Amino acid sequence: MNYHVMTLFPDMIHQAMNTSIIGRAMEKGLLTINAIDIREFSEDKHRRVDDYPYGGGAGMVMAPGPVYRTYEHVMKMIDHNKEMLAQDKTMKIPEESVSERKNETRRPRVIYLTPQGKVFHQKMAEEFAKEDDLVFLCGHYEGIDERVLDQIVTDYVSIGDYILTGGELPVMVMMDAISRLIPGVLNNNASAEFESLQDNLLEYPQYTRPEVFMEQKVPDVLLSGHHANIEKWRREQSIIRTLKNRPELLEEAVLSKKEKQFLEQLRLGEDSKNV
């Protein structure tokens, strides 16, 4: 996976993402993060990238020119990398099919972080994780000139119904969530498959040593060594937690027949309490 972030604050991206799991994944060559400074593509001698909004109003608007030139630079960089990769593949695998090469010419997705976008969720992360390149555009001030957005953006995405200073923090949230789904990024690949929000359920409670803490004991089933019972308990706890905290997720939850019956019993119990 190659991330390309068009931003006014490239150091913010590099410093934050060069640590922990993401940093180790970059060291392994599993992903790259290129933060491109939009100011570098300003034609103003002071590297200015914003201007007053037509029609008046508070604040400033990011001008279309520097953003579009940054986009062109990123596209050329991606094309160059693909050409180099294609040449390497041709040397190693002469029989590569024409259809595979055509797929590689598809333009990468350009994601603009905005409160007006679709709310980011796990299934969206899974979809984005299938891409070879993802381009992110970070807005600032009162936003970006609509004309350049119309030209380059493929996906409008939000991380929630609130306002942040810029797009950098949402981009880092997205890159973290997406990267966890790339094979090899997590030390235990099963972690990405079975952690919170898998099957549209919240994660079950976790426990570690000591066995007793502040007079609270680890549930006996987790000490039993009976893997089938442990798995059943965990699924039931996930259903209980989801019903309590995020009931809307249950509409698309993947449940077995017995789990659906368990959920129905929980709901009946909740209804009886409210009578």
Curated annotation (Swiss-Prot):
S-adenosyl-L-methionine binds at G139, I159, G160, D161, Y162, I163, L164. It is found in: Cytoplasm. The keyword S-adenosyl-L-methionine applies. It catalyses: guanosine(37) in tRNA + S-adenosyl-L-methionine = N(1)-methylguanosine(37) in tRNA + S-adenosyl-L-homocysteine + H(+). The lineage of its organism: Bacteria, Bacillati, Bacillota, Clostridia, Lachnospirales. One of its GO terms (biological process) is tRNA N1-guanine methylation. NCBIfam families: PRK00026.1, trmD. It comes from Lachnoclostridium phytofermentans (strain ATCC 700394 / DSM 18823 / ISDg) (Clostridium phytofermentans). Homodimer. Keywords: Cytoplasm, Methyltransferase, S-adenosyl-L-methionine, Transferase, tRNA processing. Belongs to the RNA methyltransferase TrmD family. CDD domains: TrmD-like. This is tRNA (guanine-N(1)-)-methyltransferase. One of its GO terms (cellular component) is cytosol. GO terms for molecular function: tRNA (guanine(37)-N1)-methyltransferase activity. Its EC number is 2.1.1.228. Specifically methylates guanosine-37 in various tRNAs.
